Structure formats: C-alpha cells, structure tokens
A protein has these predicted regions:
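Surface-exposed, low-hydrophobicity beta-strand/loop segments enriched in small/polar/acidic residues
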Residues: 2-150
Length: 150
C-alpha cells in the first residue's frame, strides 16, 4: 500500500469562515490528530533509548498509550517517557505489567502537563526508560495535534 505525506499541520472542515450564528454558518475547521507508533521492548529500554518518535515543534500531545503483547516483568514493570535521556519529562514511572493498552499521562505534575500542552519551539524526540530488563514487548502510540500552538 502506498502512503501520502503532508507537511502539515492539517486542518479539516467544510465551513471555512463564520457567516452567521447557526450551525452550518459557523466555522467548523479543526486540526487533524496525528499518531506515531514505535515498537518497545523492556530489555531495549533498560537504559534510556530514543523511540524514533519525533513530535513537531509547537505540537499538543493528546494521548500516549502502551499496547503490550507481553507485559513488563521483573523487579519493576515501570516505564517512563521524556524528551531526553532522563526520560521523565512526559511520563513518570508507570506500570505497564499487563497485556493490552495502558494509558500513560503527565499525572498532576504542572511541568509535564505544560509540555503536553505545547512541546515548545523545537521538535522533540521521545525517549523511553524501563526500570530493569525483562520480558515486556509492545508498541508505544503517541497522538498529537501538529503545531497547534504555532
């Protein structure tokens, strides 16, 4: 299957300008949510590693999920995510021990929440860090609105 690449950001809607006050006459254009996916292994992230996911500058992260086919195991089943080798700027250590989907969030941390709201003036690379080696295998899914804050 072939793919098409847009430089974005991409907006969609069929009423481009507001000409009235009722539905159908009020602008309804919105941003398209983008997604990037990276395979993750617990053993491969025992030392912080780049996931290969790069979020464009001024983007708004709306959701991060870990979809495990094998739950993380060992002394700790945690993973953390960030924008550097520290790998904690986006998600603090969170258990991903179960098979299936686990939602990863900034929690109640103001600094992490602000980074989700706007990644800043530069593209950011997502790093993952597991607490220890283990059997965990899955896909990291990051959904974002491209350059919403530009």
């Amino acid at each position: 299957m072939s793919t098409t690449t847009f430089t974005g950001p991409i907006k969609a809607g069929d009423v481009l300008n507001t000409t009235g006050t009722t539905a159908g006459t009020v602008k309804n254009v919105g941003f398209v949510i983008m997604a990037q996916v990276a395979p993750i292994t617990q053993a491969g992230t025992a030392t912080a590693a780049s996931t290969g996911i790069v979020i464009p500058a001024y983007s708004h992260i709306v959701q991060i999920q870990m979809l495990n086919t094998v739950g993380f195991s060992g002394v700790s089943s945690n993973i953390s995510l960030g924008t550097s080798a520290t790998a904690t700027e986006l998600v603090a250590a969170t258990s991903v021990a179960n098979i299936g989907i686990t939602g990863l969030t900034p929690g109640t941390d103001a600094t992490r929440s602000a980074l989700w709201s706007n990644v800043g003036a530069n593209d950011v690379i997502i790093y993952a860090l597991s607490t220890n080696t283990g059997a965990g295998v899955g896909d990291l899914v990051v959904r974002y609105i491209q350059a919403e804050n530009a």
